[in-house]
Amino acid sequence: MSIRGWGLGRISALLLLSLLTVTLLAGCFGLDRAPRSVRVSDSTASSDVPESTVGASHIDGGLAGTGDTSAHATFVEKAVESGGSGNDADTMLAVRYGVHDDYERAVIDLGTGERPAGTVPEWTLTSSDGDGLLRVDLPSAMTTYVSGGKFGEGLLGSFHVVRSPDGGMFVDFFVHQPYRYRVLQMQDPARLVVDFEPTGVNLDEPPPAQGGNTVLVDPRPNSTVSDPLTVSGYSRNPEAANTVTLTDPRGEVLVRRNVRSNDWSHTWGYFEATIDLPPFSGKGTLKVGTGNARDGTFEGVEVPVRTSR
């Protein structure tokens, strides 16, 4: 063997040995441990943020420490509730889900960077009576390992992690039936637990409409709209591009507006547009979404609305 060939072989062997050593050390110190969800999304995140996944992990067995806490917490129908302290927890590590005899549970695991946080940061919960939407605002959350997913066919339907226009992130939970809720704050590691208890069968207002990579929060289907019209929601459409179109009963376009969301590659991005409505009466159709990159066909949400005039 030539000296050149021997030298290359020796270098290759050293590189392989170094790689094996790094791999073993990573396993020993848990460096490769990251929250896992059901399936990975098709989108890619930038190099300075973790790649978010789609799906809710199931809670295995009972949630440690919740027994004593839940015994002193009651289910309520409050419109607004808040709690937590500080802003050290800046990451949503996972969203987990469990079904109990008379309620369903969602758990937000919170972290500082890649590691579990010790205390629950400041949060605000908003809920409307008879509405299929409950929102948890986390102003300190800057990144997330999970962007959304489905729960099941019972009370809880799905969730979305959205970058807030005011900074931080919020989690929207979509619910199929009227409900009451209770919130539990768990420390070391930090977890925010929301339990949902059904209270009826039919909602006064259904959850926001969903289609393609778009969620339309306002207006809801069959809403009465007036001038000016505020359209809000969130999406994961390519390049954060969204088109809002309102047509009259004959299908003629009354107004069209392009609006960008504040994220799309990492998690759901919020958008909002205020539109001056031209004169029209009767029913209309509101479409929010984008065109398919290959054939231009519409992908998004389409809901009926009516004018108040």
Protein language model regions, located:
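Bacterial N-terminal signal peptides that target proteins for export
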Residues: 2-15
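Signal-peptide-cleaved, periplasmic/extracellular N-terminal interaction regions immediately downstream
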Residues: 42, 48-217, 221
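Bacterial signal peptide processing site
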Residues: 29-32
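Ser/Thr-rich low-complexity repeats and stalk/linker segments
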Residues: 221-309
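C-terminal motif of bacterial Sec signal peptides marking the signal peptidase cleavage site
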Residues: 24-27
